[in-house]
C-alpha cells in the first residue's frame, strides 16, 4: 500500500526486473520530474524507442507529468533497463492507486518478462547451434 511522507504527499514504490536489470522506482505527486540514478531521464536513456517503452505505463494511465519519479537501476544493458523501468513504474502506480490495476494488467505491464539468455552448452557452438556436421 502507498505511504505518505512528512508533508502528507502519497508515495508509491515498485521493483521492476527484466533480463538481469533491477529497477527500484519511487513515485510521488509532483510536476513530472524523472531522475534515474540522480541523472535526468533524457540524458540516461537517449534512444526514442526505449523512452517510449520506459514511459508506457504513465502514458497508458494518463499520468505523465502528474508524478515525480526517482529510479535506482543497476545491471544489464539499455534494453533490459528500459524494460525493468517499465515494470517498476507499473508496480509503483499500482502501489500508489489500485484503480490502475485493470488497465496495467490487461496490457501486461504488471507481469514480469521472465526471458533470459540461455546458457551455452558444452559440445555445441552456442546455446543451441551445433558444429558443422560432415558425413565423410
UniProtKB/Swiss-Prot annotation:
GO terms for molecular function: RNA binding; structural constituent of ribosome. InterPro entries: Ribosomal_Su5_D2-typ_SF, Ribosomal_uS9, Ribosomal_uS9_bac/plastid, Ribosomal_uS9_CS, Ribsml_uS5_D2-typ_fold_subgr. GO terms for cellular component: cytoplasm; small ribosomal subunit. GO terms for biological process: translation. SUPFAM superfamilies: Ribosomal protein S5 domain 2-like. Keywords: Ribonucleoprotein, Ribosomal protein. It comes from the Bacteria. The keyword Ribonucleoprotein applies. Belongs to the universal ribosomal protein uS9 family. This is Small ribosomal subunit protein uS9. The lineage of its organism: Bacteria, Pseudomonadati, Spirochaetota, Spirochaetia, Spirochaetales.
